[in-house]
């Protein structure tokens, strides 16, 4: 069994990116800049944005965090986004979710200029993903999953990939990326009947449902590759959506939780920020 070590891989990728950014600065004088916006005092959001800020600093990307009070109106947030859209020194914009309930998340996502939409959530980027447009900013977690498969030499072409979960953030985009990578893709969701009959056929199984230990050993084919996107808190520990201990001995490769997909998400955010800067300055 191969352990797909996202933590180690992300370190290697960030080292490569640091070199690329240094070279880009020497050639153009440009240092990519990411602006992250937090609305309210959600501790998890602050922690997550803080880790993004540290990652930016480490590779040589400028970053700024704008923290707005919980009472910020939707209009005030949209006006700030407009200002950042027009600021040529800002290459990438991120609005940390969740937002307060009085703010329409969709309106906020749509307001970000597609070329600065570092999370890849804007409809223009979703459409570009379908069309395999090279200018597409791909959603960070799905992009990280495909990078892991590639870096570990796991063939997607002709493979049967089963994705459990159909969210806009992970399930749908990773299904499309796998399809773009020439896999045959089955996407399962809460209305899928006889889930086990699908998962046991998977050469590559991606699980993103937010339920600890949801995928058990009898649901996985011998020799499969399992990508566990889940992050769940159980008895003070972080666990995935897959019963890791039960599944690990029958698979060819598997991601651990923590230390699997998670670190790759922030790494791909850094790569997307660099992509934003390159596209905006062509």
Swiss-Prot record:
Binding positions for NADP(+) per the UniProt entry: 165-167, 231
Catalytic activity: (6R)-5,10-methylene-5,6,7,8-tetrahydrofolate + NADP(+) = (6R)-5,10-methenyltetrahydrofolate + NADPH; (6R)-5,10-methenyltetrahydrofolate + H2O = (6R)-10-formyltetrahydrofolate + H(+)
Enzyme Commission code(s) on record: 1.5.1.5, 3.5.4.9
SUPFAM superfamilies given in the database record: Aminoacid dehydrogenase-like, N-terminal domain, NAD(P)-binding Rossmann-fold domains
Top-rank lineage group of the source organism: Bacteria
Pfam family, one: THF_DHG_CYH_C
Cellular component, GO, one term: cytosol
Matches recorded under InterPro entries: Aminoacid_DH-like_N_sf, NAD(P)-bd_dom_sf, THF_DH/CycHdrlase, THF_DH/CycHdrlase_cat_dom, THF_DH/CycHdrlase_CS, THF_DH/CycHdrlase_NAD-bd_dom
Keywords: Amino-acid biosynthesis, Histidine biosynthesis, Hydrolase, Methionine biosynthesis, Multifunctional enzyme, NADP, One-carbon metabolism, Oxidoreductase, Purine biosynthesis
GO molecular function terms listed in the Swiss-Prot or TrEMBL record: methenyltetrahydrofolate cyclohydrolase activity; methylenetetrahydrofolate dehydrogenase (NADP+) activity
Pathway: One-carbon metabolism; tetrahydrofolate interconversion
GO biological process, one term: purine nucleotide biosynthetic process
Self-association and partners: Homodimer.
The family this protein is said to belong to: Belongs to the tetrahydrofolate dehydrogenase/cyclohydrolase family.
Function according to Swiss-Prot or TrEMBL: Catalyzes the oxidation of 5,10-methylenetetrahydrofolate to 5,10-methenyltetrahydrofolate and then the hydrolysis of 5,10-methenyltetrahydrofolate to 10-formyltetrahydrofolate.
Protein name: Bifunctional protein FolD
The species this protein was found in: Francisella philomiragia subsp. philomiragia (strain ATCC 25017 / CCUG 19701 / FSC 153 / O#319-036)
